[in-house]
Amino acid sequence: MSNPHADRLIAFLISSGIKDQRVLDAMHCLPRESFVSQAMMHQAYDNNALPIGQGQTISQPYIVARMTELLELQRASNVLEIGTGSGYQTAVLAQIVDHVYSVERIKSLQWEAKRRLKQLDIYNVSTKHGDGWLGWETKGPFDAIIVTAAAEVIPQALLSQLKDGGKMVIPVGDAEQQLLRIERKGDEYLSTVVEMVRFVPLVAGDLA
């Protein structure tokens, strides 16, 4: 059954320059209202970041689509997400690749995201409670790394876990944040500024 709210969102994303049909299809089929509180459900398909508790947010749909598209994912891509949050970005990735690894520093958010993903029959995701600055070394190296919080500097551990030819999308900065796309070429990392963004900070350590 068609969802007019989802239809409207996808039309907006297309008009905003999103071209990857796999990203559009993934976001069209996912019930975004399942990833926000009941009080926020009426805004679920608006192009806004929404609070999810613990000082964190679910990113605006355009940014989710843009960051996912920039990774140029293949079905077999080994993907690491830093910042599980609500699980929405995780779910979008899981529609496109065979398996997603996701690290969340706030235990309550990790468990809530796991519950949501299970309710939606999304099982090709492994989540971990831990420090996102450290990545998930035992599951790497990764073809793609997506970071959903802003780092003051690019975490060295994440660069080292990126496969040769792999791509990372990460917001960097404090008050002024730039969305960077980084591609590894041997021992070199080629960085491109995509656009200005605003994310919650990538905090070191983990929180029970």
Curated annotation (Swiss-Prot):
- Where are the disulfide bridges? none
List, from the UniProt record, the residues annotated as the active site of this protein: 59
Molecular function in Gene Ontology: protein-L-isoaspartate (D-aspartate) O-methyltransferase activity
Presence of the UniProt keyword DNA damage in the record: no
Alphabetized, the UniProt keywords read: Cytoplasm, Methyltransferase, S-adenosyl-L-methionine, Transferase
Q: Name one GO cellular component term.
A: cytoplasm
Q: Among its keywords, does the record have S-adenosyl-L-methionine?
A: yes
- Any one GO biological process: methylation
Catalytic activity reported: [protein]-L-isoaspartate + S-adenosyl-L-methionine = [protein]-L-isoaspartate alpha-methyl ester + S-adenosyl-L-homocysteine
Tell me which InterPro entries the record gives: PCMT, SAM-dependent_MTases_sf
Q: Under which EC number(s) is this enzyme classified? A: 2.1.1.77
Alphabetical list of PROSITE patterns matching this protein? PCMT (PS01279)
Q: Where in the cell is it found?
A: Cytoplasm
A Pfam short name: PCMT
Family note:
Belongs to the methyltransferase superfamily. L-isoaspartyl/D-aspartyl protein methyltransferase family.
Write out the function statement from the record.
Catalyzes the methyl esterification of L-isoaspartyl residues in peptides and proteins that result from spontaneous decomposition of normal L-aspartyl and L-asparaginyl residues. It plays a role in the repair and/or degradation of damaged proteins.
**Known NCBIfam families for this protein?**
pimt, PRK00312.1
Entry protein name: Protein-L-isoaspartate O-methyltransferase
UniProt organism field: Vibrio parahaemolyticus serotype O3:K6 (strain RIMD 2210633)
What gene, per UniProt, encodes this protein? pcm
